[in-house]
């Protein structure tokens, strides 16, 4: 009799509309209960039985119950699931399979089966890609997943690489395809094969993008020719190879190996500027005045060159610093190295005075055995030879940015707008508390930004610099010319790595149109979105593989008294993140390791400090000694403890 009662339906509707609800993200804990985080300040308790309906990271709407002053959340509706496609480890075998997602806060095995047409008999320990098919908040009885791809077996030494690439849905190998002959582009190529061009790279580099030639001119001027590998001489726009490169957008550099954007035959051979091999190039000729200014007579042209020597960073640096036993093979090569060092010096000074120079941070290199084991991790400081190449490339990219802006009005530009205008007042207020006075309007201009950066660089520590990083906007890829505040430049467009960056290939085609006096089509904005997304995924992949290898490397140090110098990089409510100075590993120090009495401890992300009994004991950028307390291989987490 109550079945179709309109009054009852109305009452139900009223009760439903009056019941308090909240939307937020589920945060799981290791204790079985969880929280519904509505915003930074408000969260609701989710009891263990209710947590069985949801997963860490799910965005849900929940009913809020109040009992005895305590509020709790009952999940009601799924807004956005945390897991859709994921990687994990298979449990069980054949007809009774489950998969445990590879995520630090997802511990429960999800029942699953292999998708139709997937011809692999899954067994315990296998790694797989899965997709969620059922969710309790969608009216299903339980969670259920489908295995869509076999990655590798559990004991494969190369699990970190294969699992990471599958997680981010990235290619595992070089693209297929060959380029048999050069295109007829209607370009006249200048013959520069007689000039003493040199390449400077790591000893193991095969994909040499750039060769340099320097010459002294009257009036204390210097000429620099930057010659860049020319893959667009082989790859036609819109061709199969071009489309593959467009999707990949970049060569993916992972510890131990790379997955190239172009077929290796092109990247490591036909286009690579190998010593004593004639190669087509796109080149830029520029004149530098005595103070390092790039004069206005910039010239882009097509050419053929023959590199006369493959030089190695460390050997060149040693020779310039009068150490080591390496010698240039001829006086002509020695003269090139001396002139290039002079150019580097001038350009470095010019950028220091008129733009911005990054602080040198070492690169960390993993030395791996044949089975992917980490033999060592070495810090490679950026030395004079690295800076020679860097200054030449930055100068060449400044030239391209100017020419594309003035001749076409578009290109693929790296744009960085400095501080987000919405943060300008907060930034000025923060700086004021540290004794630096800036105008909130001025700091949004390129000159104002550069002025502030120079003041920050002159500070005794990097603490204040670390505090203002959160106010900065992100660098973007744009088809529109715009400033790059981070470099302190009015415009910056890269073209010096076309073997490994698709955006540089686009700029090559645009520069060739300028050389030939032809009209060019503006690149579509979608390509910049694809490039930004690929760059993000590649960086995440590099970080994930690195985390795995760091965990492997430091595992046997856990529980020993081995000390490591570590820089504090971040402070949060739960503790501190530190970077080990010698090898670059990131470790976490939980708050209880800092001080036993929680009420006397304040970890402030806002201030970048840790206070104990009101005294600042640690701050971001401090370098402290730590030992490794624990390495959790299943989450690749490294837990450290400060040395008392």
Curated annotation (Swiss-Prot):
Keywords: Cytoplasm, Exonuclease, Hydrolase, Nuclease, RNA-binding. Residues 561-643 form the S1 motif domain. InterPro entries: CSD, NA-bd_OB-fold, RNase_B_OB_dom, RNase_II, RNase_II/R, RNase_II/R_CS, RNase_II/RNase_R, RNR_Ribonuclease. GO terms for biological process: mRNA catabolic process. It is found in: Cytoplasm. Its EC number is 3.1.13.1. It holds the Pfam family S1. The keyword Nuclease applies. It catalyses: Exonucleolytic cleavage in the 3'- to 5'-direction to yield nucleoside 5'-phosphates. GO terms for molecular function: exoribonuclease II activity; RNA binding. Its main location: cytoplasm. GO terms for cellular component: cytosol. It comes from the Bacteria. Residues 189-516 form the RNB domain. It is an enzyme of class 3 (hydrolase). Belongs to the RNR ribonuclease family. RNase II subfamily. Involved in mRNA degradation. Hydrolyzes single-stranded polyribonucleotides processively in the 3' to 5' direction. NCBIfam families: 3_prime_RNase, PRK05054.1, RNase_B. This is Exoribonuclease 2. It comes from Shigella sonnei (strain Ss046). The lineage of its organism: Bacteria, Pseudomonadati, Pseudomonadota, Gammaproteobacteria, Enterobacterales. The gene is rnb.
